[in-house]
């Protein structure tokens, strides 16, 4: 019945819940037979109507709980029975029964094939069980036969054999236990041999074997002994791990790592390793500093050993400061190199293990190993920053323990060089910018450099005041890179190894310090050696001085006996890079010196000893800036002050002349004036002595300033024979131009280290100061030009000329010859000066331009002094000027002649009509009021009347009014 209900449920029907017992209550609800099924199927059916009948059956009939159907139906009857209603209800129940029976019949017929198939399977199973029963019966019969065939003796033999096997096993166990008891001797030997993996492997195997025999009473004591041995191995292993921190050995470290891996303590080993590195840094720096302190103290007092590291650093003497710092950095380098090689080892073995794991099949062990490798990698990467931070703090404490302001410049530079190399190590070690080290030395460097710079400025003033402005002869191919102070520029562009050891590798990838010194050596040892080598290079001979024959030939043409010693050092040909060979013939040397002399005359730089000192000072400043880039701005600012002071001194000595500005020729550009005013306000102490009433702020400001320099009394600038000190003026001015050129050459190097926010200062310095150096030529050489020609004498000669002639003259006036004679004399004296000092073409052109410009303006001034002039007189003026130009062009190559139009335009203005002259006066404001007024007065009576004269004079006055 349950099966029928489940079938009806899957068909979406609600089956009545009556059981077989319930069916007995109503005969009408019994299961129909086959005949009845057939009749039910043959009856015409309406599926929809049947479904509605089934749906109309009450829910209680589908309940799984048993209940009394008869009682249920009787209780439903009303108190008053109605026969018709009862019959209708009965018919309804019959219809519902019929519908359910028909549905059940359909479902049974539908499942008939499955029933047949299941019945066949049951029959087959029954057959198999019967066969199994037969086999079991046969087996029991055979067992009984075998049991009856064995005797008691056979069973006894088997028991003895079993006992024998047990005794053999016991003997093996006893021998193994005996071997385990003697294992401690072998373990001690292996520990002495530092075979930690083997010792641990043996100990673990013994423990594993002992656990097999734990049922023996003697094994418990052995287990305890093995555990103690294992702990002893771990202690020795930790000691071995600590040795890695100062001297990394691949084989040693490989054994240690294998041992920790066998113990399953790879992560613990890494934690211990970092602790040992931290301890190694502390112990190393303390021992190094303690050694120097005790050495300098000269006694064996143990009080220093009880001091803290910070207090110990204050006891380092200045003499031992640099060696101690170098040894400190060497020792710290060894620690960091060991850490670097440790990371290399792990990286290499990680790759090997990853490749091996890819071929293996043990997934669980591979995952665990991968996790360990990941932990070790992260720990090592994190340790980089931590270790470098410890190194920085230790070195910072050492640096701040001594006052560096008392050090000599070279010693201070060497300290900075060591610290800079250490910061380079830090950047390669972990990518750190070493803020701790930079900050610790930046303030000291700035303070040191301020004091140093102040002393250098005072020295520069002393040099300038003692300078006689004599030419310092140098080679035609002289370059500041040949100077010792600028060697670092070439070294910074080449590898730090010597050329003989430099590999001929084509790869452009830079070699790090760790790669370079991984197999041996120390970058801080190279640093000290490098300094010694440079000192020897500076003192080296140039290869000519040792041979007297060659030296005499050299002196025949260009003796360099007066060349400063610093310029004789380390001369190398720029074209070949080779030192001149000593074994050359006298003739070859002579011809070479002739060509050198010629080059010197044409191209040799013009500079003085003071200029050279400034250049050397700039090189030293750049060395400090290159080593300590955070103070680059301060250093460049001080460098600019060196140039400013040199420029101001040249202007003060040779270019300051109030009469220059009155000419109105714009000899000093507005940019040059602004620069000079800025220098005077910011750098020059004009008071000369301290004012006791000055405020503290003013006193501090004056400390930053330098008194204005005074020209050496030996320099004579008033002699006409020397063209008023032209040689000294040329040397001074052109040395400034040369200095500016060197600053231009160094600009890319300065720009590379200047902080981005400060680069506008550098750009302004170059655009407003360095570029104005050549502009000093005009005011300085103008003073020579103003005195070299006797312009006053020419004016007197012009005043004696009669200009109101009535006929056209064919002969020029005598003042023209006098002026040309002055120019010839000027040219002669200029040639005399050029024998002492090479006069560059730009200087020669400026001198000639100034002289010609002054001469032409003097001519106009002379014409403006004329009281009466006729048309023929004006023609005579033109004749004189043309004659002057024709002869002048033979003396100079300057084209066009300066201010030529200035004279010609003034002469031609005489012929202008009233209206044209008024317009001309307004357009030509380059002429003075006197010159314009004289022009109008001279024209009066010829072609201008008095009324027109008044009008023109009023126009001139109107033009002149804004100038007052």
Curated annotation (Swiss-Prot):
Residues 81-107, 216-244 form a coiled coil. It is found in: Recycling endosome; Membrane. There is a cross-link at residue 963 (Glycyl lysine isopeptide (Lys-Gly) (interchain with G-Cter in SUMO1)). The modification Phosphoserine is found at residues 15, 494, 498, 559, 561. There is a cross-link at residue 963 (Glycyl lysine isopeptide (Lys-Gly) (interchain with G-Cter in SUMO2)). GO terms for cellular component: EARP complex; membrane; perinuclear region of cytoplasm; recycling endosome. Acts as a component of the EARP complex that is involved in endocytic recycling. The EARP complex associates with Rab4-positive endosomes and promotes recycling of internalized transferrin receptor (TFRC) to the plasma membrane. Within the EARP complex, required to tether the complex to recycling endosomes. Not involved in retrograde transport from early and late endosomes to the trans-Golgi network (TGN). Belongs to the syndetin family. This is Syndetin. It comes from Mus musculus (Mouse).
């Amino acid at each position: 019945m349950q099966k029928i209900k489940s079938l009806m449920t899957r068909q979406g029907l609600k089956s009545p819940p009556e059981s077989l017992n319930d069916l007995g209550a109503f005969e009408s609800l019994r299961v129909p037979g086959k005949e009845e099924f057939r009749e039910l199927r043959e009856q015409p059916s309406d599926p929809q109507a049947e479904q509605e009948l089934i749906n109309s059956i009450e829910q209680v009939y589908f309940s799984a709980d048993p209940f009394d159907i008869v009682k249920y139906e009787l209780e439903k009857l009303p108190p008053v029975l109605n026969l018709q209603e009862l019959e209708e209800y009965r018919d309804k129940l019959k219809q519902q029964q019929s519908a359910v029976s028909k549905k059940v019949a359909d479902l049974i017929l539908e499942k008939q094939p499955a029933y047949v198939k299941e019945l066949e399977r049951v029959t087959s199973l029954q057959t198999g069980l019967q066969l199994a029963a037969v086999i079991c019966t046969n087996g029991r019969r055979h067992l009984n036969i075998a049991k009856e065939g064995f005797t008691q003796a056979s069973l006894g033999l088997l028991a003895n054999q079993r006992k024998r096997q047990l005794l053999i096993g016991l003997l093996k166990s006893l021998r193994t236990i005996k071997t385990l008891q003697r294992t401690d001797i072998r373990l001690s030997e292996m520990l002495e041999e530092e075979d930690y993996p083997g010792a641990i492997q043996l100990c673990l195997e013994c423990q594993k074997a002992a656990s097999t025999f734990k049922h023996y009473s003697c094994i418990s004591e052995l287990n305890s002994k093995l555990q103690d041995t294992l702990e002893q191995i771990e202690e020795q292993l930790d000691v071995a791990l600590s040795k890695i921190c100062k001297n990394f050995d691949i084989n040693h470290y490989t054994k240690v790592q294998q041992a920790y891996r066998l113990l399953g303590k790879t992560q613990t080993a890494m934690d211990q390793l970092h602790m040992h590195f931290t301890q190694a840094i502390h112990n190393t720096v303390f021992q190094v500093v303690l050694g120097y302190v005790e050495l300098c103290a000269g006694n064996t007092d143990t009080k220093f050993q009880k001091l803290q590291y910070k207090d110990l650093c204050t006891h380092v003497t200045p003499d031992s400061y640099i060696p101690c710092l170098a040894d400190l950095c060497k020792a710290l380098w060894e620690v960091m190199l060991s850490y670097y090689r440790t990371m290399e080892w792990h990286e290499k073995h990680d790759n090997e293990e990853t490749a091996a794991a890819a071929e293996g099949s043990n997934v669980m062990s591979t995952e665990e190993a991968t996790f360990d490798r990941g932990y070790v990698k992260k720990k090592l990467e994190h340790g980089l920053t931590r270790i470098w931070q410890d190194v920085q703090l230790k070195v910072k404490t050492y640096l701040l323990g001594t006052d560096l302001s008392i050090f000599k410049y070279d010693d201070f530079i060497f300290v900075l060089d060591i610290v800079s190399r250490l910061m380079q190590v830090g950047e390669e070690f972990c990518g750190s910018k070493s803020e701790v080290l930079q900050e610790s030395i930046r303030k000291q460097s700035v303070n040191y450099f301020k004091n140093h710079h102040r002393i250098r400025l005072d020295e520069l003033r002393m040099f300038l005041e003692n300078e006689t402005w004599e030419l310092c002869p140098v080679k035609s191919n002289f370059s500041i890179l040949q100077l010792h102070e600028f060697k670092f520029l070439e070294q910074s562009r080449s590898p730090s190894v010597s050329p003989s050891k430099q590999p001929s590798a084509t790869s452009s990838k830079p070699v790090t310090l760790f790669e370079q010194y991984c197999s041996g050596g120390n970058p801080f040892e190279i640093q000290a050696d490098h300094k010694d080598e440079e000192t020897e290079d500076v003192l080296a001979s140039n290869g000519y001085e040792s041979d007297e024959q060659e030296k005499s030939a050299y002196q025949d043409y260009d003796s360099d006996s007066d060349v400063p010693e610093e310029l004789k050092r380390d001369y190398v040909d720029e074209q070949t890079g080779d030192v001149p060979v000593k074994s050359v013939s006298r003739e070859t040397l002579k011809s070479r010196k002739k060509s050198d002399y010629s080059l010197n005359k044409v191209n040799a730089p013009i500079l003085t000893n003071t200029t050279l000192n400034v250049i050397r000072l700039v090189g030293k400043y750049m060395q400090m800036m290159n080593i300590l880039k955070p103070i680059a701005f301060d250093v460049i600012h001080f460098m600019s002050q060196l140039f400013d002071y040199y420029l101001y001194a040249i202007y003060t000595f040779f270019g300051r002349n109030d009469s220059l500005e009155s000419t109105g020729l714009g000899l000093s550009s507005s940019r040059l004036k602004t620069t000079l005013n800025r220098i005077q306000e910011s750098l020059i102490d004009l008071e000369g002595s301290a004012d006791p009433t000055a405020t503290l702020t003013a006193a501090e400001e004056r400390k930053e300033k330098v008194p204005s320099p005074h020209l050496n009394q030996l320099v004579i600038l008033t002699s006409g024979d020397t063209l008023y000190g032209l040689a000294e003026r040329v040397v001074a001015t052109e040395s400034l131009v040369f200095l500016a050129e060197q600053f231009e050459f160094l600009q890319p190097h300065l720009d590379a280290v200047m902080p981005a926010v400060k680069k506008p200062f550098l750009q302004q310095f170059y655009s407003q100061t360095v570029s104005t150096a050549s502009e000093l030529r005009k005011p300085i050489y103008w003073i020579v030009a103003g005195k070299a020609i006797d312009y006053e004498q020419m004016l007197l000669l012009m005043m004696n000329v009669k200009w109101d002639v009535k006929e056209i003259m064919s002969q020029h006036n005598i003042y023209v010859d006098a002026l040309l004679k002055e120019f010839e004399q000027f040219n002669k004296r200029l040639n005399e000066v050029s024998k002492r000092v090479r006069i560059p073409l730009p200087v020669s052109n400026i001198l000639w331009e100034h002289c010609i410009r002054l001469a032409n303006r003097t001519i106009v001034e002379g014409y403006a002094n004329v009281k009466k002039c006729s048309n023929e007189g004006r023609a005579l003026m033109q004749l004189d000027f043309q004659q002057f130009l024709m002869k002048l062009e033979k003396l100079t190559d300057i084209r066009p002649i300066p201010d030529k139009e200035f004279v010609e335009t003034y002469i031609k203005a005489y012929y202008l009509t009233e209206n044209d002259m008024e317009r001309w006066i307004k357009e030509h404001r380059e002429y003075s009021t006197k010159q314009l007024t004289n022009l109008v007065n001279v024209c009066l009576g010829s072609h201008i009347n008095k009324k027109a004269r008044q009008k023109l004079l009023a126009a001139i006055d109107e033009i002149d009014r804004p100038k007052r």
